[in-house]
From Swiss-Prot:
Top-rank taxon: Bacteria
Source organism of this protein record: Bacillus subtilis (strain 168)
The protein, known as: L-asparaginase 2
A GO biological process held by the record: asparagine catabolic process
Additional facts recorded: B.subtilis contains two L-asparaginase isoenzymes: L-asparaginase I, a low-affinity enzyme located in the cytoplasm, and L-asparaginase II, a high-affinity secreted enzyme.
Family the entry assigns: Belongs to the asparaginase 1 family.
Length: 375
């Protein structure tokens, strides 16, 4: 009898400690279960005195891998998921409450307009919440500057948005991805980074999306701001040196909230013996805008100018940029009279981003030129 009472008591205690006294468990779908686990994990480790940073992963070399640790070029980009990227840098938990989500996992040459819109909309949604203090986007370096500038024009918040990548895959000896990611999270959580537009962090440097560009095919110091200089540096602490003067983020005229697609804008590269047929082909393919990467100060050959003039008369906006990599493309009276616009100091790939967004607002050449002068 005594043994039976002890058994009943033991069973009751077990019932309480295992939570069986609660109502029956509701069965979750695998998707719901995964979401619940993710939220629970984040809540359990969250520190109230640290900034909440969301990492949005898109792929690229930073998510690349290869069987050889010595390979820095023969790897596959976009194969490592966001959770693995976060787990590889546990030190981030000391500077921020970090959570992540996978937007896509591709090499950045495969980032298209649909992905750009998806990313910008997701960032705006997240930053509208008081629970998110900053965003880090992991991205391939090949087109990183294009995405960065697009976000610089379309994010509607002064909270920090930082784009980060790497030049070596995650499996390489001395991979630069973990350090870059740590620094990006640090910058995204810094109060001083607010109001500076979209920033790019690699190789201990902080750059403005407006001016930064990739300058080398393989080296880790590939991103430069050339004549304009870096916004800041990271040496344990963050040091901001320059202010951003061009309009950006919440001060721009552009919004992606109601956009499902962007106008087709193509880039034509100028060279000796180029011809009007290049413009004809772009117009025939459906281009609403064309950026011409001209020689020198956005110069066109006679043949190219004929093609550009023809495109404008068919309702296509043409913007002159330069293939030189530096300098301002200045207005030219002869070109201006034909509505061949000047990109100011935007390189061709960034001029394309601005022109796509400008064309969602207007087709007026003077208004579009004003955008290039402002942004």
């Amino acid at each position: 009898m005594k043994k039976q009472r002890m058994l009943v008591l033991f069973t009751a205690l077990l019932f309480v400690f295992t939570g069986c006294s609660h109502s029956p468990e509701t069965k979750e779908s695998p998707k719901e279960k995964a979401q619940t686990q993710k939220v629970s994990s984040a809540s359990a480790s969250e520190k109230k005195d640290l900034p909440n940073i969301r990492i949005l992963a898109t792929g690229g070399t930073i998510a690349g891998a290869d069987q050889s640790k010595t390979s820095t070029t023969e790897y596959k980009a976009g194969v490592v998921g966001v959770e693995s990227l976060i787990e590889a840098v546990p030190e981030m938990k000391d500077i921020a409450n970090v959570s992540g989500e996978q937007i896509v996992n591709v090499g950045s040459t495969n980032i298209d307009n649909k992905i750009l819109l998806k990313l910008a909309k997701r960032i705006n949604h997240l930053l509208a919440s008081d629970d998110v203090d900053g965003i880090v986007v992991t991205h391939g370096t090949d087109t990183l500057e294009e995405t960065a500038y697009f976000l610089n024009l379309t994010v509607k918040s002064d909270k920090p948005v930082v784009i980060v990548g790497s030049m070596r895959p995650s499996t390489a000896i001395s991979a630069d991805g973990p350090s870059n990611l740590y620094n990006a999270v640090k910058v995204a959580g810094a109060p001083e980074a607010k109001g500076k537009g979209t920033l790019v962090v690699l190789n201990d440097r902080i750059a403005s999306a407006r001016y930064v560009t990739k300058t080398n095919t393989t080296t880790t110091d590939t991103f430069k701001s050339e004549e304009m200089g870096f916004v800041g540096t990271i040496a344990d602490d963050i040091y901001f040196n320059n202010e951003i003067t061009r309009k950006h983020t919440k001060d721009t005229d552009f919004s992606v909230s109601n956009l499902d697609e962007l106008p087709q804008v193509d880039i034509i590269y100028g060279y000796q013996n180029d011809g009007s047929y290049l413009f004809d082909a772009a117009v025939k393919a459906g281009a609403k805008g064309i950026v011409f990467a001209g020689s020198g100060n956005g110069s066109l050959s006679d043949a190219a100018e004929k093609g550009a003039d023809s495109a404008v008369k068919k309702g296509v906006t043409v913007v002159r940029s330069t293939r030189t990599g530096n300098g301002v493309v200045t207005p030219n009276q002869d070109y201006a009279e034909k509505d061949l616009l000047a990109s100011n100091s935007l390189n061709p790939q960034k001029a394309r981003m601005l022109l796509m967004l400008a064309l969602t607002k207007t087709n007026d050449p003077q208004k579009i030129q004003a955008y290039f002068n402002e942004y």
